[in-house]
Amino acid sequence: MNEIYLIGLGNPGKKYSKSRHNIGFLVLENLSKKYNANFLLKDKLKSSCSEFKINNSTYRLFLPNTFMNNSGDAVRAIVDWYKINLDQLFIIVDDKDLPLGKIRFRKKGSSGGHNGLKSIIEQLQTHNFNRIRIGIGSPPLIKGTNTSNTISHVLGNISLEEKSILDKVYERLIESLSLIHI
């Protein structure tokens, strides 16, 4: 049996539920709905968890209950509990340096300035894990300056225009995830 572990990064709580920074959560919530798989809180994993099977593959989904900057705590707990080979692990994360809706897959790499990935790299003591980055676009420049407010952008809610683009991205990504075989 092939086992795939998908961890979506985001911040817990209603306040952040529709924010750009919660793209990882939103992808897995859409995936779980498609396969009628409910999330259950598992304190020992510091996450809400769900799973489903497609053919000979089991997909385990995790939404960390830690805040983004401490995502590594939950990832470490999950990796240790399931004794995961890192080839089986996929981290789904927002990326402000990619255009809205662009998907980028990497088998290894730096945090790219993303604090959630930085936390995971610190906890796992390696850069060698799969990550699926989803573009949320760059923050707009502050009027009359050459600077932008990154925090306001990533923590800001997804607009209706962005949602229509991201809904298509979720569908493409969900179709792609079902093709993963380790």
Regions found by a protein language model. Give the residues of each.
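Intrinsically disordered, low-complexity regions enriched in acidic/Ser/Thr/Pro/Gln residues
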Residues: V154-N157
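Phosphate- and other anionic-substrate recognition elements at nucleic-acid/protein interfaces
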Residues: S111
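Nucleotide and nucleotide-moiety/phosphate-recognizing core
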Residues: N2-K107, K118, E122-R133, P139-S152, ...
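Glycine-rich phosphate-binding loop at the start of an alpha helix
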Residues: H114
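A hydrophobic, small-residue-rich beta->alpha segment in the mid-to-C-terminal subdomain
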Residues: L160-E161
